[in-house]
Amino acid sequence: MAHKKGTGSTRNGRDSNSKRLGVKAYGGETVTAGSILIRQRGTSVLPGVNVGQGKDDTLFALTDGVVTFESIRRSLRNRKRISVVASS
């Protein structure tokens, strides 16, 4: 006879690392060229003027300036666009 009780298996016990997604520079903030503005999966926020888009859909500033957000109307859903107004 066994002197130890057999332990059952479990299907839990896994968790992924957080990806730190979200807005990194809010409206009205001053940013420098190359600054990350938004980390996202997919294009929930579209790039506007002076904003580039990386291969992982990260939005970043192309010039120094001030961050602005605007809502744009698309056929099926409203979207947001982020732009950088160049500092003069």
Curated annotation (Swiss-Prot):
Disulfide bonds: none annotated. One of its GO terms (biological process) is translation. GO terms for cellular component: cytosolic large ribosomal subunit. One of its GO terms (molecular function) is structural constituent of ribosome. It holds the Pfam family Ribosomal_L27. The keyword Transmembrane helix does not apply. It comes from the Bacteria. Keywords: Ribonucleoprotein, Ribosomal protein. Residues 1-24 are annotated as: Disordered. Belongs to the bacterial ribosomal protein bL27 family. This is Large ribosomal subunit protein bL27. It comes from Prochlorococcus marinus (strain MIT 9303). The gene is rpmA.
